Amino acid sequence: MVVGPVPVLARAVGVLLVLAGLVAAAAAFPTYLVVGGTEVSPVTGVADALVALVAPVATLAVGVGLLLGRVPRLGLGYAAVAGSLAVGRLLIELYQGHGSTVRPAVEVLAGERVITSSVEISAGWVLGVVALSLTVLAAVVALVAWGRTVMEDGGALDPLRPALAGAAAVLGVGAVLCLALPAADVPDRVVTDPATGLETVVTQEGPQALLERPGLALLGGLLLAGALLLCAVIAPSLRPRLGAVGGLLGVAVFLLAAALTGLRDAARSADVEWTVPGAGLLVVGLGFAGLTLLAWRWRAQRVPSVGA
C-alpha cells in the first residue's frame, strides 16, 4: 500500500465527519418532534441508545481516522456514500418538520403511532438536520479531495471486483425494495361480533411508504432510493481496495441503522409490529457488512516472478 501526503481537504472531510457524528449522537437524546401534542424521543433506554448510536459512532470513528491521515481513501469513500444517502434523508426530515401537516397522516416515529395534525420541531430534529447537512457537505468536499489523494495498492482486489459488484447490485435492488415499505407497521385488527361470533379483519391505517408522501418527502424518497442503488453499484469499483471498503461500509451502516430502527420501533410499542421488509432490510444490511468484511480481508494469491 502506497499512501502519499494527505491533502488538507481530506483532513477537512475528517473534521466534518467528526462533527456530523457528534451532532448526530447528541440528536438522539432530546425530544425529536412534538406531533399532535405527543412528544417523540428516539431514546428511552439503553437498547434505544445503542440503536441510535450505530451510525454516529461509525461516522465518528471514520472521521477520526481520516483526520489523522490514516488510509484516507477509505474515509473519503465512506464520506461520499454517506453524504449521497444523506441528501434524500435531509429532504425527508425537512418535510417531517415543516410540511407533514399539509396532508395529515398516520406516522410511526420512534415507536409512537401519531397523526401529523400538528408538528412542532424540537432540539432533536434541529440537531439531526445539522448532522445530515454536515454529512452532505463532507461528501462534496470528499469528491473534490478524492483525485488529490494519493493512495494505491497492488490491485489485490481486482480479481474479486466483478463478483463483488454483482453481489452488491443484487443486494442494492433488494435494499431499495425493502426501503420502499415501512420497516414497522400497524397490524390489522380482528373484531369479533359478540352476537354471531363472526370475526372481521379491520385494516388500520399505518405509516406511509417511502414514495407515498408528497412534496419534499417524495423527492427525498426518490433521491434516497436512487442514491442507494447507485452507491451499491459504484462502491466495489473504488480504488484502492480500502476505498471500496469505505464505500461498502457507508452502505452497510446506513442499512443496518435503518433496519435496527424499525426493529426498535416495533419492540417499543404493542401497536406496531416489525414487517417483512424490515427484516429484509436487516438481511441486506448484513449482506453489505459481509461484502465489506470480504473486501477488507481479501488477499489475492501472488504469482512469484521468474528468477525471484
Regions found by a protein language model. Name each.
Residues V2-A308:
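Compact integral membrane and secretory-pathway proteins
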